[in-house]
UniProtKB/Swiss-Prot annotation:
NCBIfam families: PRK05309.1 (NF003698), uS11_bact (TIGR03632). One of its GO terms (cellular component) is ribonucleoprotein complex. It holds the Pfam family Ribosomal_S11. It comes from Acinetobacter baumannii (strain AB0057). The gene is rpsK. Keywords: Ribonucleoprotein, Ribosomal protein, RNA-binding, rRNA-binding. This is Small ribosomal subunit protein uS11. Gene3D superfamilies: Ribosomal protein S11. PANTHER family: 40S RIBOSOMAL PROTEIN S14/30S RIBOSOMAL PROTEIN S11.
Length: 128
């Protein structure tokens, strides 16, 4: 006879305001939706949605990732989002638009791309 497996009920909490962190690199786009304290509620990546290789870095892949993360965070009762965009990737604007299309009211969009004050030496230029 099989043992009864006890599954713990997932504790759902309601959060009215959150922060969407969009990390858009040249190779991938990562969308993380957190509460105000920074605790992750939902996340998605372009690569995790089935896009591989150079298709990961397209605006459409970033849009799909933002939609998936946005719909997953709707379970927490989120209504308003502040958007923090980091990185120079091609999926920056399309991810923000996708979050608005899911149904969130976007309060602010902030660019938090780290800019060095002459820090590390950048990689050498490509010769194709």
């Amino acid at each position: 006879m099989a043992k009864d497996t006890r599954t713990r009920k997932k504790v759902t909490r309601t959060v009215s305001e959150g922060v969407a962190h969009i990390h858009a690199s040249f190779n991938n786009t990562i969308v993380t939706i957190t509460d105000r304290q920074g605790n992750a509620l939902a996340w998605a990546t372009s690569g995790g949605q089935g896009f591989r290789g150079s298709r990961k870095s397209t605006p459409f892949a970033a849009q799909v990732a933002a939609e998936v993360a946005g719909k997953a965070a709707l379970d927490y009762g989120l209504k308003n989002l502040d958007v923090l965009v980091k990185g120079p990737g091609p999926g920056r604007e399309s991810a923000v638009r996708a979050l608005g299309a899911v149904g969130y009211k976007i309060n602010s969009i902030t660019d938090v791309t780290p800019i060095p004050h002459n820090g590390c030496r950048p990689p050498k230029k490509r010769r194709v």
